Amino acid sequence: MNALRLAVLAALWGALCACGPIKSTAFLLDAEVQIEAARTAGADKLSPYEWTAANLYIHKAREEVGYSDFEAGVEYAGKASKFANEARDKAMAVARGDPGAGVVTPPSP
């Protein structure tokens, strides 16, 4: 009975230890796909702020995962994905010629 309990605890511990690397890898892959979609839409030229932010965040995410700080890696990868989506959407709007696309309006006081 003790051996079974120990085996179950060891399996559970192993599964919990693997959650960080698996989750961070999934978030990194998603962000990389979003960045590639933004590149395809021409975001590097049509939406440079969001494009640059996405690339800097994915770089930082990879760095944090390299240091085994998976929580920070997931956070930065999520930000990279968010900025890549914004870059793609903005680039597509500019390419379509939507009025106001790419125009930044200051926040109201």
Question: Which residues make up each language-model segment?
Answer:
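Sec-dependent bacterial lipoprotein signal peptides
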Residues: 1-19
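Long, charged/polar, soluble alpha-helical segments
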Residues: 19-109
